[in-house]
UniProtKB/Swiss-Prot annotation:
It is found in: Cytoplasm; Perikaryon; Cell projection, Dendrite; Cell projection, Axon. Interacts with ced-9. Interacts with vps-34. Interacts with sorf-1 and sorf-2. Belongs to the beclin family. One of its GO terms (biological process) is germ-line stem cell division. GO terms for molecular function: phosphatidylinositol 3-kinase binding; protein-macromolecule adaptor activity. The lineage of its organism: Eukaryota, Metazoa, Ecdysozoa, Nematoda, Chromadorea. This is Beclin homolog. Keywords: Autophagy, Cell projection, Coiled coil, Cytoplasm, Endocytosis, Endosome.
Amino acid sequence: MTTQRSHICLNCQHPLRLDFTQRRPDSADSEKKSETVITEALTGHSRNLMKLISDAQFPSDAPVCNDCSDALRNEMDAQVATLDDEIKTYQTYINYLKENHPTTSIPDLKAKLQNVSDEEKELEQQLKKLLAEEEQLDLDLQTKRRTAEAASEKSGELWKKYRDNLRQVFEDQDELHSLEAERQYAEVQHRKLTDTNVLDLCFHIWVDGIVGEINGFRLGYLKDAPVEFTEINAALGQIVLLLEILLERIGVQHHELMPVAMGSHSYIKLRRNGIDMETYALYGQGTPLSGSSGIDPGIRRFLQLLEFLLKELKDRNKNFKPPYQIHADSLVDNGVKYNAVMTLNTDVRWTRAMALMLTDLKAACAQCDALRSPI
């Protein structure tokens, strides 16, 4: 009786019915072992179907259906054809090597291979060395980058400081230019003040025709242009004050006479041995040139002080020459003497004498200003 068992195709898993009558009789252990091998092959990691088929002695050892058998056979034929092509290729290359390198021997190739191997080892050592150097360079590069970042940060701070300092410099330069402009302006004004005769500003002396003036007060008297004694007294007070300032300016003092400026009641004081001996009034009342004014002694003493001042100025500057010479109680113009006292004098000549006296005072002012030390 024929025994049949149910199996499945190892490839497509379709059920198969195998006739085991054609199988080689084995022991039960052998049959059990064969089934175990098939099961392990089917459930194993590789499931090497070709190996099972190749190792099978009977169809029942590796059951495969006809379709899968044909497919496997065709695949094996394709692999065999591929292997044949590879064999031909290798054979062709072997023939090429034999033809083109007939003298190449195995020892030479081994030696060459050894050299290549040694060179490879040397290159590997060089590569390790280069890798170590590269690692060190990476460390150095990181260090330098950190240093560069710190330097860049410091450079940024320094740039900010430079910017702030530069802005401060520009502001200081602007302020310096402003101060320099102010200094130049002050220097110009100072030069103007230095070149300005303060006495000329404070005591404006002007001679218009015959009648002379000082600070707007007329010092003269004409019948066709009468001047009150109040104005003449004010003018005399101005010239006494000016004479006092000029004597103080050059640092001299008459040994006996001293001008005392008291406005419209000025006078000349006579001192001997430190004692006030007498005063000479330079103010009058009534009608000028009437003979009763009483200012002639004061005018004489004033002319003495003026002559003393002009002499001191000439001693300090030999080139200085007063416009008009003083002789006793007169002033000389082109050899003509003009008496400065009112008694027995005409209005024109006395007025002319006062104008000449004012001109000498104006010249004394200019000379005192020229003698002062530069500031």
